Amino acid sequence: MPYKENKLRQLGKSSISATDIASQFWCEKQMELNYLYGKKYTEQMRKGRQIHETLQAETFIPLTVEPVTYADYMYKVGYEDYMALKTLDEKGVCRELQIYGSLNGYRIVGKIDELRKEKESTRIIELKTIEANARIAAFDEAKMKLHTVQIMLYKRLLDSIKNREYTLYNFAKSYGIESLKLSDTFLRGLHTIGIKEEFANIGEIYRMVFDAISALPPISEKLELRYIDRFSGKQASSIIINYSEEKINSQLKFALGYWNGDREALPVSEEEKWKCKLCKFYGKECKVWWNGD
Protein backbone atom coordinates (compact mmCIF):
# COMPACT_ATOMS: atom_id res chain seq x y z
CA MET A 1 0.00 0.00 0.00
CA PRO A 2 2.77 2.61 0.65
CA TYR A 3 3.73 2.62 -3.03
CA LYS A 4 0.14 3.39 -3.97
CA GLU A 5 -0.13 6.21 -1.48
CA ASN A 6 3.22 7.71 -2.40
CA LYS A 7 2.55 7.69 -6.15
CA LEU A 8 -0.80 9.42 -5.76
CA ARG A 9 0.62 11.86 -3.22
CA GLN A 10 3.55 12.63 -5.50
CA LEU A 11 1.11 13.77 -8.18
CA GLY A 12 -1.23 15.52 -5.74
CA LYS A 13 -4.08 13.10 -6.42
CA SER A 14 -6.56 11.08 -4.37
CA SER A 15 -7.96 9.06 -7.26
CA ILE A 16 -7.06 7.95 -10.78
CA SER A 17 -9.15 9.19 -13.68
CA ALA A 18 -10.05 7.14 -16.73
CA THR A 19 -8.29 9.87 -18.73
CA ASP A 20 -5.10 9.29 -16.71
CA ILE A 21 -5.14 5.60 -17.58
CA ALA A 22 -5.89 6.26 -21.25
CA SER A 23 -3.09 8.86 -21.38
CA GLN A 24 -0.60 6.22 -20.27
CA PHE A 25 -1.09 4.67 -23.71
CA TRP A 26 -0.07 7.90 -25.46
CA CYS A 27 2.92 8.75 -23.29
CA GLU A 28 3.05 7.73 -19.65
CA LYS A 29 5.92 10.12 -18.98
CA GLN A 30 3.90 13.04 -20.34
CA MET A 31 0.92 12.09 -18.17
CA GLU A 32 3.12 12.19 -15.07
CA LEU A 33 4.83 15.46 -16.05
CA ASN A 34 1.45 17.11 -16.59
CA TYR A 35 0.73 16.59 -12.89
CA LEU A 36 4.22 17.49 -11.70
CA TYR A 37 4.54 20.71 -13.73
CA GLY A 38 0.98 21.60 -14.67
CA LYS A 39 -1.16 20.95 -17.71
CA LYS A 40 -1.58 23.85 -20.10
CA TYR A 41 -5.19 24.61 -21.04
CA THR A 42 -5.00 25.02 -24.82
CA GLU A 43 -7.32 26.64 -27.33
CA GLN A 44 -8.07 23.17 -28.72
CA MET A 45 -9.11 22.00 -25.25
CA ARG A 46 -11.31 25.08 -24.82
CA LYS A 47 -13.11 24.38 -28.10
CA GLY A 48 -13.53 20.73 -27.19
CA ARG A 49 -15.02 21.67 -23.81
CA GLN A 50 -17.36 24.12 -25.52
CA ILE A 51 -18.67 21.39 -27.82
CA HIS A 52 -19.28 19.08 -24.84
CA GLU A 53 -21.15 21.80 -22.93
CA THR A 54 -23.31 22.61 -25.94
CA LEU A 55 -24.25 18.94 -26.38
CA GLN A 56 -24.99 18.56 -22.67
CA ALA A 57 -27.27 21.62 -22.72
CA GLU A 58 -29.32 19.95 -25.47
CA THR A 59 -30.43 17.28 -22.98
CA PHE A 60 -30.76 19.12 -19.64
CA ILE A 61 -29.73 22.34 -17.92
CA PRO A 62 -26.85 21.80 -15.46
CA LEU A 63 -27.35 22.90 -11.85
CA THR A 64 -26.89 26.67 -11.68
CA VAL A 65 -26.16 26.86 -7.94
CA GLU A 66 -22.39 27.17 -7.45
CA PRO A 67 -20.81 24.84 -4.85
CA VAL A 68 -19.03 26.37 -1.86
CA THR A 69 -17.61 23.22 -0.24
CA TYR A 70 -16.49 19.73 -1.26
CA ALA A 71 -19.87 18.39 -0.10
CA ASP A 72 -21.66 20.93 -2.32
CA TYR A 73 -19.48 19.90 -5.27
CA MET A 74 -20.26 16.20 -4.77
CA TYR A 75 -23.98 16.99 -4.58
CA LYS A 76 -23.81 19.02 -7.80
CA VAL A 77 -22.10 16.12 -9.61
CA GLY A 78 -24.67 13.65 -8.27
CA TYR A 79 -27.62 15.89 -9.14
CA GLU A 80 -26.39 16.37 -12.70
CA ASP A 81 -25.78 12.62 -13.02
CA TYR A 82 -29.35 11.96 -11.90
CA MET A 83 -30.76 14.52 -14.35
CA ALA A 84 -28.65 13.02 -17.15
CA LEU A 85 -30.01 9.54 -16.38
CA LYS A 86 -33.57 10.91 -16.35
CA THR A 87 -33.08 12.23 -19.88
CA LEU A 88 -31.80 8.80 -20.92
CA ASP A 89 -35.08 7.33 -19.71
CA GLU A 90 -37.23 10.10 -21.23
CA LYS A 91 -35.37 10.96 -24.44
CA GLY A 92 -33.15 7.93 -25.03
CA VAL A 93 -29.91 9.88 -24.61
CA CYS A 94 -27.84 11.29 -21.75
CA ARG A 95 -24.57 13.19 -21.77
CA GLU A 96 -21.71 13.95 -19.36
CA LEU A 97 -22.33 11.13 -16.87
CA GLN A 98 -19.71 10.94 -14.13
CA ILE A 99 -19.09 7.44 -12.83
CA TYR A 100 -16.97 5.89 -10.11
CA GLY A 101 -15.32 2.58 -9.42
CA SER A 102 -12.40 0.76 -7.87
CA LEU A 103 -9.39 -1.07 -9.32
CA ASN A 104 -6.97 -2.88 -7.01
CA GLY A 105 -7.92 -0.57 -4.16
CA TYR A 106 -7.61 2.65 -6.17
CA ARG A 107 -10.51 5.06 -6.55
CA ILE A 108 -11.32 5.43 -10.25
CA VAL A 109 -13.42 8.22 -11.72
CA GLY A 110 -14.50 8.92 -15.29
CA LYS A 111 -17.02 10.94 -17.26
CA ILE A 112 -18.93 9.22 -20.06
CA ASP A 113 -19.65 11.60 -22.91
CA GLU A 114 -22.89 9.96 -24.03
CA LEU A 115 -25.22 7.01 -23.41
CA ARG A 116 -27.92 6.03 -25.88
CA LYS A 117 -30.77 3.60 -25.41
CA GLU A 118 -31.06 1.07 -28.20
CA LYS A 119 -33.70 -1.65 -28.60
CA GLU A 120 -32.44 -3.92 -25.86
CA SER A 121 -29.21 -2.33 -24.71
CA THR A 122 -27.41 0.86 -23.72
CA ARG A 123 -24.58 2.08 -25.94
CA ILE A 124 -21.59 4.06 -24.68
CA ILE A 125 -20.39 6.80 -27.03
CA GLU A 126 -17.14 8.68 -26.56
CA LEU A 127 -16.84 12.02 -28.36
CA LYS A 128 -13.44 13.28 -29.48
CA THR A 129 -12.65 16.51 -31.28
CA ILE A 130 -10.24 16.52 -34.23
CA GLU A 131 -9.00 18.82 -36.93
CA ALA A 132 -10.65 17.05 -39.84
CA ASN A 133 -8.39 18.54 -42.50
CA ALA A 134 -5.09 17.88 -40.75
CA ARG A 135 -4.98 14.14 -40.24
CA ILE A 136 -1.84 11.99 -40.11
CA ALA A 137 -2.16 8.19 -40.21
CA ALA A 138 0.32 7.47 -37.39
CA PHE A 139 -1.24 10.15 -35.20
CA ASP A 140 -4.74 8.79 -35.77
CA GLU A 141 -3.71 5.22 -34.99
CA ALA A 142 -1.92 6.26 -31.80
CA LYS A 143 -4.88 8.35 -30.62
CA MET A 144 -7.28 5.52 -31.43
CA LYS A 145 -5.36 3.26 -29.04
CA LEU A 146 -5.85 5.51 -26.04
CA HIS A 147 -9.46 6.31 -26.98
CA THR A 148 -10.17 2.56 -27.14
CA VAL A 149 -8.67 2.01 -23.68
CA GLN A 150 -10.78 4.86 -22.29
CA ILE A 151 -14.12 3.71 -23.69
CA MET A 152 -13.51 0.07 -22.68
CA LEU A 153 -12.72 1.24 -19.15
CA TYR A 154 -16.00 3.19 -19.11
CA LYS A 155 -17.92 0.03 -19.96
CA ARG A 156 -16.11 -1.89 -17.25
CA LEU A 157 -16.93 0.79 -14.65
CA LEU A 158 -20.55 1.13 -15.75
CA ASP A 159 -21.04 -2.66 -15.79
CA SER A 160 -19.60 -2.83 -12.28
CA ILE A 161 -22.22 -0.38 -10.98
CA LYS A 162 -25.07 -1.88 -13.00
CA ASN A 163 -24.27 -5.40 -11.78
CA ARG A 164 -23.94 -4.12 -8.19
CA GLU A 165 -20.29 -5.16 -7.94
CA TYR A 166 -19.43 -1.55 -7.07
CA THR A 167 -22.29 -0.44 -4.86
CA LEU A 168 -23.59 2.73 -3.28
CA TYR A 169 -22.07 1.46 -0.02
CA ASN A 170 -18.62 1.13 -1.64
CA PHE A 171 -18.92 4.62 -3.10
CA ALA A 172 -20.24 6.25 0.09
CA LYS A 173 -17.51 4.66 2.20
CA SER A 174 -14.75 5.63 -0.24
CA TYR A 175 -15.85 9.27 -0.54
CA GLY A 176 -17.11 9.77 3.01
CA ILE A 177 -20.61 10.62 1.79
CA GLU A 178 -22.30 9.84 5.12
CA SER A 179 -20.36 12.58 6.92
CA LEU A 180 -20.79 15.27 4.26
CA LYS A 181 -23.10 18.19 4.96
CA LEU A 182 -24.21 20.76 2.41
CA SER A 183 -23.35 24.37 3.21
CA ASP A 184 -26.16 26.71 4.26
CA THR A 185 -25.41 28.97 1.29
CA PHE A 186 -25.69 26.08 -1.16
CA LEU A 187 -28.88 24.77 0.49
CA ARG A 188 -30.50 28.18 0.21
CA GLY A 189 -29.59 28.22 -3.47
CA LEU A 190 -31.17 24.79 -4.00
CA HIS A 191 -34.38 25.87 -2.29
CA THR A 192 -34.45 29.08 -4.34
CA ILE A 193 -34.53 27.13 -7.60
CA GLY A 194 -37.26 24.84 -6.30
CA ILE A 195 -35.41 21.66 -5.32
CA LYS A 196 -37.50 19.90 -2.68
CA GLU A 197 -36.11 19.23 0.79
CA GLU A 198 -35.98 15.45 0.32
CA PHE A 199 -33.83 15.83 -2.80
CA ALA A 200 -31.47 18.36 -1.20
CA ASN A 201 -29.64 15.46 0.41
CA ILE A 202 -26.34 14.13 -0.87
CA GLY A 203 -26.94 10.53 0.23
CA GLU A 204 -30.39 10.45 -1.37
CA ILE A 205 -29.23 11.91 -4.69
CA TYR A 206 -26.53 9.24 -5.07
CA ARG A 207 -28.96 6.50 -4.07
CA MET A 208 -31.12 7.57 -7.01
CA VAL A 209 -28.08 7.66 -9.32
CA PHE A 210 -26.96 4.14 -8.42
CA ASP A 211 -30.52 2.79 -8.66
CA ALA A 212 -30.95 4.37 -12.11
CA ILE A 213 -27.70 2.85 -13.40
CA SER A 214 -28.65 -0.57 -12.02
CA ALA A 215 -31.96 -0.34 -13.91
CA LEU A 216 -30.32 0.36 -17.29
CA PRO A 217 -30.69 -2.15 -20.12
CA PRO A 218 -27.51 -4.26 -20.61
CA ILE A 219 -24.48 -2.22 -21.65
CA SER A 220 -23.75 -2.98 -25.31
CA GLU A 221 -20.55 -4.78 -26.33
CA LYS A 222 -20.45 -2.38 -29.28
CA LEU A 223 -18.76 0.84 -28.19
CA GLU A 224 -18.74 3.92 -30.40
CA LEU A 225 -15.95 6.44 -30.89
CA ARG A 226 -17.40 9.52 -32.53
CA TYR A 227 -15.06 12.15 -33.93
CA ILE A 228 -16.26 15.76 -34.10
CA ASP A 229 -14.69 18.49 -36.24
CA ARG A 230 -13.32 20.93 -33.67
CA PHE A 231 -14.17 24.00 -35.72
CA SER A 232 -17.58 23.19 -37.21
CA GLY A 233 -18.85 21.00 -34.37
CA LYS A 234 -20.09 18.48 -36.95
CA GLN A 235 -19.44 14.75 -36.90
CA ALA A 236 -16.39 13.81 -39.00
CA SER A 237 -16.39 10.04 -38.51
CA SER A 238 -17.59 7.21 -36.29
CA ILE A 239 -15.88 3.94 -35.37
CA ILE A 240 -17.38 0.91 -33.61
CA ILE A 241 -15.14 -0.89 -31.11
CA ASN A 242 -15.89 -4.42 -29.92
CA TYR A 243 -15.44 -4.70 -26.17
CA SER A 244 -12.83 -7.24 -25.07
CA GLU A 245 -12.59 -8.22 -21.41
CA GLU A 246 -9.25 -9.93 -22.06
CA LYS A 247 -7.80 -6.86 -23.76
CA ILE A 248 -8.89 -4.32 -21.15
CA ASN A 249 -7.66 -6.58 -18.33
CA SER A 250 -4.23 -6.77 -19.96
CA GLN A 251 -4.13 -2.99 -20.50
CA LEU A 252 -5.20 -2.25 -16.93
CA LYS A 253 -2.57 -4.65 -15.56
CA PHE A 254 0.09 -2.69 -17.47
CA ALA A 255 -1.30 0.70 -16.42
CA LEU A 256 -1.59 -0.21 -12.74
CA GLY A 257 2.07 -1.28 -12.72
CA TYR A 258 2.93 2.42 -12.75
CA TRP A 259 0.48 3.37 -9.98
CA ASN A 260 1.63 0.41 -7.87
CA GLY A 261 5.18 1.75 -8.01
CA ASP A 262 6.41 -1.36 -9.83
CA ARG A 263 8.12 0.85 -12.42
CA GLU A 264 8.83 4.46 -13.28
CA ALA A 265 6.78 6.31 -15.90
CA LEU A 266 7.72 5.06 -19.36
CA PRO A 267 8.59 7.41 -22.23
CA VAL A 268 7.45 6.64 -25.77
CA SER A 269 9.31 4.01 -27.76
CA GLU A 270 11.81 4.99 -30.45
CA GLU A 271 9.19 4.16 -33.10
CA GLU A 272 6.85 6.73 -31.58
CA LYS A 273 9.32 9.48 -30.73
CA TRP A 274 7.55 11.65 -33.33
CA LYS A 275 5.10 12.35 -30.50
CA CYS A 276 7.82 14.24 -28.63
CA LYS A 277 7.68 17.23 -30.96
CA LEU A 278 4.02 17.64 -30.00
CA CYS A 279 4.92 17.77 -26.29
CA LYS A 280 5.62 20.93 -24.25
CA PHE A 281 8.09 19.02 -22.05
CA TYR A 282 10.31 17.98 -24.96
CA GLY A 283 13.87 19.23 -24.53
CA LYS A 284 13.08 20.68 -21.10
CA GLU A 285 11.73 18.46 -18.34
CA CYS A 286 12.06 15.42 -20.64
CA LYS A 287 15.13 14.78 -22.82
CA VAL A 288 14.75 11.05 -23.46
CA TRP A 289 14.68 11.49 -27.26
CA TRP A 290 15.92 15.06 -27.42
CA ASN A 291 18.90 15.59 -29.73
CA GLY A 292 19.28 19.32 -29.28
CA ASP A 293 17.10 20.33 -32.24
Language-model regions, residue ranges each:
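Metal-dependent nuclease catalytic cores that hydrolyze phosphodiester bonds in DNA/RNA
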Residues: 1-124, 135-137, 175, 291
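Long, low-complexity, compositionally biased intrinsically disordered regions
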Residues: 1-9, 88, 239-243, 253, ...
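Cysteine-cluster motifs in flexible loop/terminal segments that predominantly coordinate metals
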Residues: 6, 20-35, 249-293
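Short, solvent-exposed segments of well-ordered alpha helices
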Residues: 15, 141-145, 270
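Non-catalytic, well-ordered alpha-helical scaffold segments
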Residues: 18, 48-53, 148-152, 273-277
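Solvent-exposed amphipathic alpha-helical surface segments
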Residues: 58, 62, 161-165, 262
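Short, flexible loop/turn segments with low-complexity composition
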Residues: 67-71, 169-174, 264-274
